[in-house]
């Protein structure tokens, strides 16, 4: 992913890079434009866009997004209790869906990011964005109802 972002951002015609999870069942042709428009309209001054969405399964109407609901949210809340509200922790807590794999950024930002290439991509990338960009240059975009291919959760 890091090589892709740098390769595409070196293209003189490319102004932004947008990436989407490959397992989206409800992908809409509107998603790319929703993600990149805040970056292309210079009046907004946005450098990074992170998606959020409702994680309701279309198969069984069950709420998905277990990793965020059952791990990341409680982990950030526990860290807040242990170390207090620091600026970085508040930043991470400000994202409606921090593990969303859909994000977009400007060519200039892409050239300065150290993009993680393994587990932890989403939080690692948010950390890099925090290191490189003022929070006023970050936006979240609602992509509406979103359904991924799901893995069954079984307790053995």
Predicted segments — roles?
Residues 139-155:
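Active-site donor/metal-binding and catalytic loop motifs
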Residues 11-25:
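Short beta-strand-to-loop acidic/aromatic patch adjacent to the donor-nucleotide binding site
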Residues 57-69, 80-102:
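A recurrent flexible, glycine/aromatic-enriched loop bordering the glycosyltransferase active site
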Residues 69-79, 156:
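Catalytic core of nucleotide-sugar-dependent glycosyltransferases
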């Amino acid at each position: 992913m890091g090589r892709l972002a740098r390769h595409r951002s070196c293209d003189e015609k490319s102004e932004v890079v947008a990436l989407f999870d490959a397992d989206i069942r409800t992908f809409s042709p509107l998603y790319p434009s929703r993600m990149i428009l805040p970056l292309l309209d210079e009046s907004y001054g946005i450098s990074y866009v992170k998606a959020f969405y409702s994680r309701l399964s279309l198969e069984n109407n069950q709420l998905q997004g277990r990793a965020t609901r059952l791990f990341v949210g409680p982990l950030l809340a526990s860290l807040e209790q242990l170390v207090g509200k620091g600026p970085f922790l508040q930043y991470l807590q400000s994202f409606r869906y921090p593990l969303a794999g859909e994000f977009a950024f400007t060519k200039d930002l892409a050239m300065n990011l150290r993009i993680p290439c393994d587990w932890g991509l989403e939080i690692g990338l948010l950390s890099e964005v925090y290191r490189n960009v003022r929070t006023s240059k970050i936006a979240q975009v609602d992509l509406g109802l979103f359904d991924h291919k799901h893995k069954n959760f079984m307790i053995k």
